[in-house]
Structure formats: structure tokens, C-alpha cells
């Protein structure tokens, strides 16, 4: 018999995470490696676990993730977004909890482009009065 799987896609900055939830014992596998081997900061591991802890499903599902683009923070945010979306397929009742915590909203903040004539996006060259 085929195993039940739930899918969700999460995005943050330039990262895209394709998430699969499979009934299991709570392992989080990112690009074939354990989350603790993949992400160098414990705080980012907590960010990834947030939707599972909020819905009290941590330990009930194995999370299998393919993530690409961006850095560690963007990837952790994308994984969190993907897990939250996949949990909606598990039980639509989770929507209110996840929405209240802001986990279903795509964080649209991205780096602002550098403009010509400036040193950065907004930083102007030093001004000399005389």
C-alpha cells in the first residue's frame, strides 16, 4: 500500500523549498542530510521546527526537504513556510493556528537593488560642504 504523503512549497528571499511530510518519528532531512548537519545554527533549526511545535505534530511526521537558492536564513524560512503549507493538507483545522503565528504568509522582503550614483541601495557618497 502506498504511504500517505503531504506536499508544500515554501519561499523566502531567493530560496525555494519543496517539502514532503511522511508519517514517521520526527526526522528532518534537508537535501539528503540531517537538519543539524545542514544548518550551522541551532536558532535556525528552531525556526524550521516552529510549525510542527505549534500544531503539536512534532514527532509524528518525518520531513523530507529539497531546498535551493539563497543562504541559511532564507532556506530556513523557506522550509518553515513549506512545512506550514504541507500541514494544511494534513488537517485544515491548523489554518487558524498557523495563520495567527504568521507562518502561512510569504515573507516578501528581499534585498533592495543598488542604485547608480550611490554606494549601496540608499547610502550616498560622503557630502563635503566646502
UniProtKB/Swiss-Prot annotation:
GO terms for biological process: translation. Coiled coil: none annotated. Gene3D superfamilies: 3.30.230.10. It comes from the Bacteria. Pfam families: Ribosomal_S9. InterPro entries: Ribosomal_Su5_D2-typ_SF (IPR020568), Ribosomal_uS9 (IPR000754), Ribosomal_uS9_bac/plastid (IPR023035), Ribosomal_uS9_CS (IPR020574), Ribsml_uS5_D2-typ_fold_subgr (IPR014721). GO terms for molecular function: RNA binding; structural constituent of ribosome. GO terms for cellular component: cytosolic small ribosomal subunit. Keywords: Ribonucleoprotein, Ribosomal protein. Belongs to the universal ribosomal protein uS9 family. PANTHER family: RIBOSOMAL PROTEIN S9, SMALL RIBOSOMAL SUBUNIT PROTEIN US9M. This is Small ribosomal subunit protein uS9. The lineage of its organism: Bacteria, Bacillati, Bacillota, Bacilli, Bacillales. The gene is rpsI.
